[in-house]
């Protein structure tokens, strides 16, 4: 369900317009705690995101030594009308979090060997771009297979219920 201009998809209920969803992260990692972070963007990046483009595949967040959280390898395509004022498509972008949240992320990454993974990027009601990030632990191959089996069973169960009822 997207707008007529082919822009970001609107999710029913909470008023968020989802730009990008990192479905691969939920398969490859078991997600623990999640955080909502603002993101520092250039004007051409925001306009490009308004068209509903952008990808979080292979993106990750890292805590720098200066205590900042950076979103690395997220893809935001160039905005054609920006001409010479365009941006780099995969540049590191600063995530905006409270100091306590940054300290919690840094501690989990250092002590427990967890990874900070972006889960989705969306527009709020006020038009701000937010990124939902999660503390993640990598899954083993057996866990991934188990996830596939569960999804398959849920699909089969739904199919049987549709046919029967």
From Swiss-Prot:
GO CC term, one of those recorded: cytosol
Annotated compartments: Cytoplasm
GO MF term list: RNA binding
UniProt keyword Electron transport, yes or no: no
Alphabetical list of Pfam families matching this protein: SmpB
Keywords: Cytoplasm, RNA-binding
Main location: cytoplasm
GO biological process entries: trans-translation
Family stated for the protein in its record: Belongs to the SmpB family.
Biological role: Required for rescue of stalled ribosomes mediated by trans-translation. Binds to transfer-messenger RNA (tmRNA), required for stable association of tmRNA with ribosomes. tmRNA and SmpB together mimic tRNA shape, replacing the anticodon stem-loop with SmpB. tmRNA is encoded by the ssrA gene; the 2 termini fold to resemble tRNA(Ala) and it encodes a 'tag peptide', a short internal open reading frame. During trans-translation Ala-aminoacylated tmRNA acts like a tRNA, entering the A-site of stalled ribosomes, displacing the stalled mRNA.
Protein's name according to its UniProt entry: SsrA-binding protein
Organism in which the protein naturally occurs: Parvibaculum lavamentivorans (strain DS-1 / DSM 13023 / NCIMB 13966)
Gene name, Swiss-Prot/TrEMBL: smpB
């Amino acid at each position: 369900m997207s707008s007529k201009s082919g822009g970001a998809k609107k999710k029913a209920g909470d008023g968020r317009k989802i730009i990008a969803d990192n479905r691969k992260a939920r398969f490859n990692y078991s997600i623990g705690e999640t955080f909502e972070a603002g993101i520092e963007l250039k004007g051409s990046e925001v306009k490009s995101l308004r068209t509903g483009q952008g990808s979080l595949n292979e993106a990750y967040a890292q805590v720098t030594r200066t205590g900042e959280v950076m979103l690395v390898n997220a893809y935001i395509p160039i905005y054609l009308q920006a001409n010479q004022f365009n941006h780099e498509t995969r540049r590191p972008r600063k995530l905006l979090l409270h100091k306590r949240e940054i300290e919690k992320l840094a501690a989990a990454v250092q002590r427990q060997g967890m990874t900070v993974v972006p889960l989705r990027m969306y527009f709020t009601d006020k038009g701000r771009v937010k990124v939902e990030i999660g503390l993640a632990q990598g899954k083993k191959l057996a866990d991934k297979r188990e996830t596939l089996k569960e999804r398959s069973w849920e699909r089969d169960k739904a199919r049987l219920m549709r046919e029967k009822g």
